[in-house]
Swiss-Prot record:
GO cellular component, one term: cytosol
Protein EC: 6.2.1.5
Residues making up the signal peptide according to the UniProt record: none
Name recorded for this polypeptide: Succinate--CoA ligase [ADP-forming] subunit beta
Binding of substrate, residues: N264, G321, I322, V323
Keyword Transferase annotated: no
GO molecular function, one term: ATP binding
Entry keywords, A to Z: ATP-binding, Ligase, Magnesium, Metal-binding, Nucleotide-binding, Tricarboxylic acid cycle
């Protein structure tokens, strides 16, 4: 679950981290009033969406008058911002962040993620702030400096100083950087985050460090013990199908193709998408129904898949381990009847009672094609989409 920039900075303030004074506004009038609270300009106005690349898309602007603030708010509030990280529809702009402009001397980068290979929280710092860290990692990886947190001791001040020295910081900036490092690490651990990022972390012309931007990603599996973060969730920034799937504990990710995929198991789901692609098809989604492929869950999965108007056929790939394939077939038949599926459905069943399950599908009289193998299933669903 991602947070908006203004929400990230609210958390920074709670932990004593330096950030520009700013206010999130939902109307042009609130935006003008925010400028008055902040004081004399210039100000920076920023569209609040869960996507990067806002500046290049016109969603971030430095303004010198309240009239310009009102014009910016009127132009963006209620609209959708399209960036290189969004789809063609963009993300809705419901809030504008108005904050004091900062005299930027130098831009740095500081962030942390959970590194699966080392099984540690790893902090990354770079002198190349203000650009995508992925681009820096690809083109100049030697400019990224890392430290890993020991799960027994947690963050240590010497690690912050180590990063500061590698960034070439001196004097009071080392102390300020170490404080920010310790604060971010505390937020990361106490709030069950999966990602935290300040890009850029700015050295002002006055010689101080300030968190000019903030990006936080919470671990969705830990939200049950983070009520404050749950309240910050903005579902308007999420795909409605993904939100609906989450309510049924279905793992769904929308894609750009026209072949809906329903699979039990994340690895099998990825393999299914690969083989569909291999045979010339384009997956419309990733959908893992998990181990409990009941009629209710399968029905809901069909509803979610078919809510995408681009879907021209559905491939169901189920491995019956704990759950018997004949029971899964009953669920698929019931779901197809209830939902009223009007596109071809190709089903591949493997495992416990697979033959009985395939027979039930064949005898159902519905527009369900029982495949003999995964390759056969991929070929048949691609052919169905192509009208062959």
């Amino acid at each position: 679950m991602n947070l908006h920039e203004y929400q990230a900075k609210q958390l920074f303030a709670r932990y004593g981290l330096p950030a520009p004074v700013g206010y999130a506004c939902t109307t042009p009038r609130e935006a003008e009033e925010a400028a008055s609270k902040i004081g004399a300009g210039p100000w920076v106005v920023k569209c609040q969406v869960h996507a990067g690349g806002r500046g290049k898309a016109g969603g971030v602007k430095v303004v010198n008058s309240k009239e310009d603030i009102r014009a910016f708010a009127e132009n963006w509030l209620g609209k959708r911002l399209v960036t290189y990280q969004t789809d063609a529809n963009g993300q809705p702009v419901n809030q504008i962040l108005v904050e004091a402009a900062t005299d930027i001397g130098k831009e740095l980068y500081l962030g942390a993620v959970v590194d699966r290979s080392s099984r540690r929280v790893v902090f990354m710092a770079s002198t190349e702030g203000g650009v995508e860290i992925e681009k820096v990692a690809e083109e100049t990886p030697h400019l990224i400096h890392k430290v890993a947190l020991d799960p027994l001791t947690g963050p240590m001040p010497y690690q912050g100083r180590e990063l500061a020295f590698k960034l070439g910081l001196e004097g009071k900036l080392v102390q300020q950087f170490t404080k920010i490092f310790m604060g971010l690490a505390t937020i990361f651990l106490e709030r069950d985050l999966a990602l935290i990022e300040i890009n850029p972390l700015v050295i002002t012309k006055q010689g101080d460090l300030i968190c000019l931007d903030g990006k936080l990603g919470a671990d969705g599996n830990a939200l049950f013990r983070q009520p404050d973060l749950r309240e910050m969730r903005d579902q308007s920034q999420e795909d409605p199908r993904e939100a609906q799937a989450a309510q049924w504990e279905l793992n769904y990710v929308a894609l750009d193709g026209n072949i809906g995929c329903m699979v039990n198991g994340a690895g099998l789901a990825m393999g299914t998408m690969d083989i569909v692609k291999l045979h010339g098809g384009e997956p419309a989604n990733f959908l893992d129904v998990g181990g409990g492929a009941t009629k209710e869950r399968v029905t809901e999965a069909f509803k979610i898949i078919l809510s995408d108007d681009n879907v021209k056929a559905v491939l169901v790939n189920i491995f019956g381990g704990i759950v018997r394939c004949d029971l899964i077939a009953d669920g698929i038949i019931g779901a197809v009847e209830e939902v009223g599926v009007n596109v071809p459905v190709v089903v591949r069943l493997e495992g416990n009672n697979a033959e009985l399950g395939a027979k039930k599908l064949a005898d159902s009289g519905l527009n369900i094609i029982a495949a003999k193998s995964l390759t056969d299933a991929a070929q048949q669903v691609v052919a169905a989409v192509e009208g062959k």
